[in-house]
Amino acid sequence: MDFEKIREEKIRFFEDHHTIVIATSHDNKVTARTVSYATEGLDFYILSWEHHEKIQQIKGNPNVALARDNISIKGVAQILGKPTDEKNKRGAEAIKKKRPKEFEMFSRIPGMIMVKVTPTYIKSWVRVDNRFFIEHLDLEKRQAYLQKPDE
């Protein structure tokens, strides 16, 4: 499989959507919730209040999972800080482009922070010639391959 082609397909898919489920965990407690996001390439940018449970869990364990439709993602979250800080300009621009009203409304609220999720692995169900496969996109190894569901 062509790694870059599959990667570009995923980029386009996530550009066309606005919400995703993020699962976070710490001290053997896992929680999940739907969040709004924007992407730059395959990096996801999310706004949240710093006191929210997901942020506290990310502080203790940056490994997260994202899910949308038939796609699941393993990734690493990084708390960037205030969305209006100069150092967060890339993420802020991505959110402004995709969700300008949301950025304007939430970015200046005290306690609002930006989180960046960098995917490491993407797995999805795909159909090829009327047969279902699990498509793997290993972003760390830069590999893409199909797997039969019964393997």
Residue ranges and their predicted role:
Residues 15-21, 96-100:
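Short Pro/Gly-enriched beta-strand edge/turn motifs at strand-loop
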Residues 11-12, 36, 56, 104-107:
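Short secondary-structure boundary/capping segments
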Residues 17-50, 55-58, 64-68, 76-78:
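Short beta-strand segments
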Residues 10, 18, 42, 111-113:
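A generic secondary-structure signal marking the coil-to-beta-strand transition
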Residues 15, 59, 66-68, 107-110, ...:
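A generic structural signal for short, non-catalytic loop/turn and secondary-structure boundary residues
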Residues 1-19, 140-151:
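Extreme N-terminal tail/first-helix region
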Residues 1-11, 48-55, 59:
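Short N-terminal signal/transit or membrane-insertion segments
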Residues 72-151:
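Charged, gly/pro-rich active-site loop segments
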